[in-house]
Amino acid sequence: MAAIEAVNAREILDSRGNPTVEVEVLLEDGTFTRAAVPSGASTGAFEAYELRDGDAGRYLGKGVQKAVAAVVDEIGPAIQDLDAADQRIIDATMIELDGTENKSRLGANALLGVSLAVAKAAADSAELPLYRYLGGPNAHTLPVPMLNVINGGSHADTNVDIQEFMLLPVGASTFSEGLRWGVETYHALKSLLKKKGLSTGLGDEGGFAPNLDSNRAALDLLMEAIDAAGFTAGKQIALGLDVASSEFYSDGAYTFEGQKVDAAHLTAYFADLVASYPLITIEDPLDEDDWAGYDHFTAELGAKVQIVGDDLFVTNPKRLADGITRGVANSILVKVNQIGTLTETLDAVSLAQRSGYTTVLSHRSGETEDTTIADLAVAVDAGQIKTGAPARSERVAKYNQLLRIEQDLGAAAVYAGRSAFPRFQA
């Protein structure tokens, strides 16, 4: 029994200079932990509600003092004296206290900060690393890092439509080797961009943000960088995309590469990319409400490539269940702040894995130095993690935590590699 003695919160800054919530939890046995909440740029319409102050005269309306007050004045007293190990009870207490479907009264950012800080405190009190506390003795698989090395869309002020172009070191034998491959290719890409007179400025997630002639041009750059770094595209390093189509969808049409197109056009476009490049995962290829489009996209490409639902599923077990029933997509992106509590996140992961959907743990574009998602990826055997380029300390912090976990596991550590992508043919 390690009862919660005190809960505190404050407003801190995320990696984009916007306020976010940090929560501290003190247990009666003296255990003290803190957790910080991330924030997205391209957000799904069905995500849990991020409570902002709306005061234009302070942080341009993006302050989170209301969420901080919710933690200190309401949530803290409601969970005081509860056992920190009773995560499900604590999360359910907060959800009931909020009383809304999307956590809009207290704010998902308030609930999540408490939920994560409590889990960390319970793990520390039990003298276990977080990945072991959450995942048990079978938590030993390190995820494939999906390194977002070219940023476009909402993550960069450029003319590139697709939001993320990723390197996936699937052929490595260990996580540390895979990360090294990705880092070396990242630096090769920087040299290439300089040589071609293109910008090496960074986007929100640490990737380069050059203006390019087309989305294909970005993929061509990645292929060239992989070769320049001494690796084999497809066999050692594969490619992935986060299209974030909802960002360029309006009034029933997609504005893509300067044209108004429909879902059938995009499906054919991505089918051509899959045939032309070692492209093994595509996230959010269509709008979050384009269910008919997803029916067609999945029928055409579902057997060939991982189709990841981010805005489509928003880490919500109910939306995921709808998708599973319809048979759309075959993977879920897992972002803890989309649903607002650790328990609901774990429920979404469990449902996905039971249903044969792969799982991808993910950061947000507005991040902090908090490394919880690294432990969570190992705890739930996600097999894949998205946490940006190997640049900017808020991104690298997660990779460094995974390196620590790999070392901690020693000979028991297993790298997911190709096995994380059951549709990958190479």
UniProtKB/Swiss-Prot annotation:
Q: Which GO terms describe its biological process?
A: glycolytic process
Range of residues in the leader sequence: none
Alphabetical list of SMART domains matching this protein: Enolase_C, Enolase_N
User: Which of the seven top EC classes does this enzyme belong to?
Assistant: lyase
Assigned keywords, A-Z: Cytoplasm, Glycolysis, Lyase, Magnesium, Metal-binding, Secreted
Q: What CDD domains does UniProt report for this protein, alphabetically?
A: enolase (cd03313)
Xref: Pfam families: Enolase_C, Enolase_N
As cofactor, the record names: Mg(2+)
InterPro entries of this UniProt entry?
Enolase, Enolase-like_C_sf, Enolase-like_N, Enolase_C, Enolase_CS, Enolase_N
Instruction: Give, as in the UniProt entry, the pathway in which the protein acts.
Output: Carbohydrate degradation; glycolysis; pyruvate from D-glyceraldehyde 3-phosphate: step 4/5
Active-site residues, as the UniProt record annotates them: E205 (proton donor), K335 (proton acceptor)
Protein's UniProt keywords contain Lyase: yes
Binding residues for (2R)-2-phosphoglycerate: Q163, K335, R364, S365, K386
The positions annotated for binding Mg(2+) are D242, E283, D310
| E.C. numbers | 4.2.1.11
Give me the comment on cofactor binding: Binds a second Mg(2+) ion via substrate during catalysis.
- What superkingdom heads the lineage? Bacteria
Mainly resides where?
Answer: cytoplasm
The Gene Ontology CC terms held by the record are: cell surface; extracellular region; phosphopyruvate hydratase complex
PANTHER family, A to Z:
ENOLASE
Q: Briefly, what is this protein's role? A: Catalyzes the reversible conversion of 2-phosphoglycerate (2-PG) into phosphoenolpyruvate (PEP). It is essential for the degradation of carbohydrates via glycolysis.
Question: What NCBIfam families does the record tag this protein with?
Answer: eno
Similarity comment text for this entry: Belongs to the enolase family.
Q: What is this protein called?
A: Enolase
Q: What is the organism of origin for this protein?
A: Clavibacter michiganensis subsp. michiganensis (strain NCPPB 382)
Organism taxonomic ancestry = Bacteria, Bacillati, Actinomycetota, Actinomycetes, Micrococcales
